[in-house]
Amino acid sequence: GPTNLAVSDNFKKRFESYGWEYVLINGHNKKEIFNALKKVQKAKKPTIISCKTKIGYGSPNKSGKSSSHGSPLGLDEIKLVRRNLNWNYKPFVIPKKILKEWRKIGKKGELLESKWNKIFKKKKNRINKILKNNFTKVLKKQKQISIKEINNLATRKSSELTLNALIKQNNTLIGGSADLAGSNNTKTKHHKITKPGDFNSNYIHYGVREHAMCGIMNGLSLHSNFIPYGGTFLIFSDYCKPSIRLAAMMKQRVIYVFTHDSIGLGEDGPTHQPIEQLTSLRSIPNLNVFRP
């Protein structure tokens, strides 16, 4: 059915309230698409291009109907769409002109990827060299401290002390928490908080946005040699699950600090008592789960 069955948002106002640039175009007009993409490349803030399109465009009998999305058009309707769009090529045939342009873009992308990989490898080698020189000593010392004081420390406090030692030696670790830094103990005295206009930092306050936090951590891991970690209560790992699953599929170095993992949690009550979460996390392929 129509989108107004479920949505009444004013998307323009929503994104403008975020401080974004909003560009509205006809999504079926290639000139408008080209001009919009050209414009946003010069933008000084995040931009969303809103492409106004019609579902099932070109289909004489299903254009503008939800049925064009949920079910096949059918062979007869496909023939009519081809005629309507003046598309005179056989199925799976790519016109030479289009193929030529695709190949050009492919070569351009290949060159950019090659340059990026060289820079990435250079930085990775430099960082690995730094880690090898310092990390073994730091970890050994911290292990001895943790073992010595284990009876007097909560696990999350022991985690904080370990992070405190690691952050001091490793500028690739990017910490954060979904509005629970004080409870998760993910923030140390060596952290500098990320603020608008100041990204020379290594700690992000994500707010009550567990899913966004884990999605951002995936991006940090994929883009550079960062090792992001983020904290929340184990019960809220369910909000993180889609992004955790993607990180595991992509074999990314993303670390999740899930505290308060006991059904013995008192004042917060049953809504904060994890029961099935640990089993669920352990069932995800490529995800290593450690429960000290």
Question: Residue spans of the language-model regions?
Answer:
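Glycine-rich ThDP/TPP pyrophosphate-binding loop and its adjacent helix/strand module
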Residues: 1-104, 269, 277, 283-292
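Thiamine diphosphate
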Residues: 24, 100, 104-292
